[in-house]
Amino acid sequence: MRRIYLDHAATTPTHPEVVEAMLPYFSDAFGNPSSLHSLGQEAKVAIEEARGKVAHLIGARSEEVVFTSGGTEADNFVLKGIAYANEPSKQQY
């Protein structure tokens, strides 16, 4: 029987090409990008390369691309950014 998944608000299936592209980072290049050791630095380089590719795809600067750990963190990041941008001290009349 074919299964149909309807809870896409919680998670979505990962496209096979994405899984294939990510496999090296699950097994070989898994270092903490904040660490100074070689595995960490390799991970940092990979993240910055990915950031550059995403920026290019969406017509942004690399420093404008922020990766978060998930939906809740992303939502909070956006809401805090909106609140900060609309602080009365930031208003120019």
Language-model segments: residues:
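Pyridoxal 5′-phosphate
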Residues: 1-93
